[in-house]
């Protein structure tokens, strides 16, 4: 569960390292974001030669959460960290690589480019 003011890791090579969630997209009263949900983030830590800079505002999709997520078969999936991938307005990643595993829920939410770039899908 990711909410406003959550600090998340950026799991791609866009240049950002840490980001602050400033809005959960999907309705005016939406409080929490889970796997595959879109958020708006402000970059807090960035590499000097990356495509995104510190204090940039960007859209992102949640790829890992510490809070467990229940699947239809009754199993649960959870990760060691909260992580996002920065995307453009079309839902495609700005980066060319993705670090760490991503959840299978991204395939169900039609983020095929992120799933194909990921080294592992759990």
Curated annotation (Swiss-Prot):
PROSITE patterns: RIBOSOMAL_L14 (PS00049). Gene3D superfamilies: Ribosomal protein L14. GO terms for molecular function: large ribosomal subunit rRNA binding; structural constituent of ribosome. Keywords: Ribonucleoprotein, Ribosomal protein, RNA-binding, rRNA-binding. One of its GO terms (biological process) is translation. It comes from the Bacteria. The keyword Mitochondrion does not apply. GO terms for cellular component: cytosolic large ribosomal subunit. InterPro entries: Ribosomal_uL14 (IPR000218), Ribosomal_uL14_bac-type (IPR005745), Ribosomal_uL14_CS (IPR019972), Ribosomal_uL14_sf (IPR036853). SMART domains: Ribosomal_L14. It holds the Pfam family Ribosomal_L14. Transmembrane segments: none annotated. The keyword Ribonucleoprotein applies. Binds to 23S rRNA. Forms part of two intersubunit bridges in the 70S ribosome. Part of the 50S ribosomal subunit. Forms a cluster with proteins L3 and L19. In the 70S ribosome, L14 and L19 interact and together make contacts with the 16S rRNA in bridges B5 and B8. Belongs to the universal ribosomal protein uL14 family. This is Large ribosomal subunit protein uL14. It comes from Gemmatimonas aurantiaca (strain DSM 14586 / JCM 11422 / NBRC 100505 / T-27).
